Amino acid sequence: MNIETAEKIARQLHEGQFRADGVTPYIEHPKAVAGLVKEYGGSEKSICVAWLHDIMEENAEGTRKLLGLNRIDSKARFIMDMRGREDWSGVLFDLARISDHWEPDQKEIKERGKVVYLAKLLLTASSDMLLVKLCDMLANIRESKGTRKSQEKRYRKAVRCFSELGDKSLTEAHKKLIAAILDRTPV
């Protein structure tokens, strides 16, 4: 899959959808995330994942039809059904892993809270997918313009927890994104 194809699919599946403000076309969010991933040196695959990162959350039925699947009932099933499809190649696994809305562990979220769940997602992400998720968080913070304080606070706590507990090697891009999320410094 190339970036143009990913963008086309995202535009198709988000057509007619709007952000929470009811005015901004939803496609502006994946566009912003893909732009940040590109700006921070993400691979072509990572940019594709950025364009597609919300397709299951926002249009599961359209995604199912587009992919020619009878049903999409779980992340694991989706990955199994899509194995070997050259047109989606390596994008699929990363797309499934980055989605915190697809098949979240509701019991874990209830027991530990959303912040811990997000921190765990960050800790287990590959370097490429960490870049996409951090760009997604930063784009959401920027787009909210202070109107979603609880989400911003949750993101900051999760990123702070991740940066204190994480032992993975962070790239300069990761470090800059973490600083931007924590400090709200323009990036």
Where are the regions a protein language model picked out?
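Active-site helical microenvironments for divalent-metal-assisted chemistry
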Residues: 1-187
